[in-house]
């Protein structure tokens, strides 16, 4: 299924995923497309931050859902 990931810059990334994919998997796909390391990615859906070990199905994320990507920058 397709889902969309919207970045803070307003860019929308389209990903091909399965409901059984973990949030880790999704972050890896974002890394493939955008080059952003997963440890800097925070994914938000319906106001909740998504935890790595959970699946899209756990959060009831269905086709054509839009997730929001927030970058967590290190230290400073």
UniProtKB/Swiss-Prot annotation:
Sites of the Glycyl lysine isopeptide (Lys-Gly) (interchain with G-Cter in ubiquitin) crosslink: 48
Presence of the UniProt keyword Ubl conjugation in the record: yes
GO cellular component: cytoplasm; nucleus
Position(s), cross-link Glycyl lysine isopeptide (Gly-Lys) (interchain with K-? in acceptor proteins): 76
Molecular function per GO: mRNA binding
Subcellular localization: Cytoplasm; Nucleus
Keyword Repressor: no
InterPro entries tied to this protein: Ubiquitin-like_dom (IPR000626), Ubiquitin-like_domsf (IPR029071), Ubiquitin_CS (IPR019954), Ubiquitin_dom (IPR019956), Ubiquitin_ubiquitin-like (IPR050158)
Predominant location category: cytoplasm
Entry similarity comment: Belongs to the ubiquitin family.
Record-given protein name: Ubiquitin
Organism in which the protein naturally occurs: Avena sativa (Oat)
Organism lineage string: Eukaryota, Viridiplantae, Streptophyta, Embryophyta, Tracheophyta
């Amino acid at each position: 299924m397709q889902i969309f990931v919207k970045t803070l810059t307003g860019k929308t990334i389209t990903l091909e995923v399965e409901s059984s994919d973990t949030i880790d998997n999704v972050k890896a796909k974002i890394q493939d497309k955008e080059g952003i390391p997963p440890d800097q990615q925070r994914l938000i859906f319906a106001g909740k931050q998504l935890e790595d070990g959970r699946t899209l199905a756990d959060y009831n994320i269905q086709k054509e859902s839009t997730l929001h990507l927030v970058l967590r920058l290190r230290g400073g």
